[in-house]
Amino acid sequence: MSRRKKRVTGEQALRLEFESVDHQPLIDALGVDIPRELLVLALTHRSFANENGMLPNNERLEFLGDSVLGLSVAGQLYQQYTSSPESDISKMRASIVSRYGLADIAREINLGQHILLGKGEQLHDGRSKDSILADTTEALLGAIYLAHGFEIARDTVLRLFKHKIDTASATGLHQDWKTTLQERLAERNLEMPTYTSTVTGPEHEQTFTAEVAVHGTVLGTGVGTNKKLAEQAAAHKAVGFLQDNPAFV
């Protein structure tokens, strides 16, 4: 007589999926501990929750994290850019906390591999979707706030977003061409860009040249006094290329 295989409950599926990945590198990247229960919740996308018996998902934490993020960035911009009018710092904040800005940070800390997704989202490369990466980043910030309070959550935000905040007024009004390029590529369902750079000249007067490519095709080349500026210039050129070549896929 064959034995009927026991069905895995939603809670069991959640535990198995969560424990299949080592989350310590994520905790290290965030720079702050998160209690296991909150970490599990923050990483549980609604697709996984719905496929496994309507488990709790991270949307409420996302709501909380959005507020923590917005206030933290707004406060820092207010203090750091004392001569900028409200209209300018408002635009800076909007760009920094946008879906694409958040997804940028998520990729820097390799968040995608830690997210608990349903089978459908996994098949559609959900771990690389800007929307899922951004929402999960906010959920993690919400979890940090609940575990440690606003001050620690704010410090985490300012550490993760330091470069974006520090460069927000590089061109008067914030224009992050790398983020804009990611947005344009996502609209066409294209893979994220790759950057390569070279440096020439003496150490005290170096010139950096960067290329940005998609599918092995170079879309733009930029020059700058450091690597970041060169990559921004290359991304700017790539955005122009996409505007001039709407059929590029």
Curated annotation (Swiss-Prot):
Residues 176-244 form the DRBM domain. Belongs to the ribonuclease III family. SUPFAM superfamilies: dsRNA-binding domain-like (SSF54768), RNase III domain-like (SSF69065). The active site is at residues 66, 138. Pfam families: dsrm (PF00035), Ribonucleas_3_3 (PF14622). The keyword rRNA-binding applies. It comes from the Bacteria. Its EC number is 3.1.26.3. GO terms for biological process: mRNA processing; regulation of gene expression; rRNA processing; tRNA processing. It is found in: Cytoplasm. Mg(2+) binds at residues 62, 135, 138. The gene is rnc. One of its GO terms (cellular component) is cytoplasm. Its cofactor is Mg(2+). This is Ribonuclease 3. It catalyses: Endonucleolytic cleavage to 5'-phosphomonoester. Homodimer. InterPro entries: dsRBD_dom (IPR014720), RNase_III (IPR011907), RNase_III_dom (IPR000999), RNase_III_sf (IPR036389). Digests double-stranded RNA. Involved in the processing of primary rRNA transcript to yield the immediate precursors to the large and small rRNAs (23S and 16S). Processes some mRNAs, and tRNAs when they are encoded in the rRNA operon. Processes pre-crRNA and tracrRNA of type II CRISPR loci if present in the organism. Residues 21-149 form the RNase III domain. The keyword Hydrolase applies.
